């Protein structure tokens, strides 16, 4: 009997397209029906150690010191090598390497000067994680409280193309939350303030709608983005109120970890634990770190 993967290969589909095409309903395994679909993107801005990352034997992840932890999932894993981000345009390679990674779109012309001759602005398109989030949030069966979580570790305290990987759309960067204690509060904050927050959001949304009537078309478009953000926060509050008993208990974080560079390994572990816990409790099905 021909396997699903072999069947797709026989169709002449490239290896790079295989992970995407194999997830289509027509090619889905019966065993995967009903399973929750999730996507997590992890980005290492300083790269990796090639000699310890790439398996010496492509068919054995145990030959990679870094990937050996995935050995039990060898048959479900695929390691791709040789993919290059060739998006050109304004900005230096570091700016494009971050802001164009998930968008595949050039940076807008702007006034942020990097290490190249031409300054640049934000990415000109939506990132793939947000595209997936929007798709899942449209369906009642796959909708979650947050939709997606944008998490960071030691992200510089500034807003520019070097620090923004996720985009809700053209010129709409999403800031990652790099404080695990703030992330914990976002996920499991006490519900006693919910009514106060809801009241404030209701009032804010109403005021923004009134203001939009007297603005020019360009300003109305920008204000509409703010209105949509308020609406998203309202939906998150409603979902939080409806959430029942947690499948997995709220994680406990060491309260004595300072957010300093020397503690990056511990902070990264805390953020990963929070992301996994949120996924397990179905608060989101899309995450970036």
Residue ranges of model-derived segments:
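Ligand-binding pockets and gating/stacking loops
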Residues: 1-288
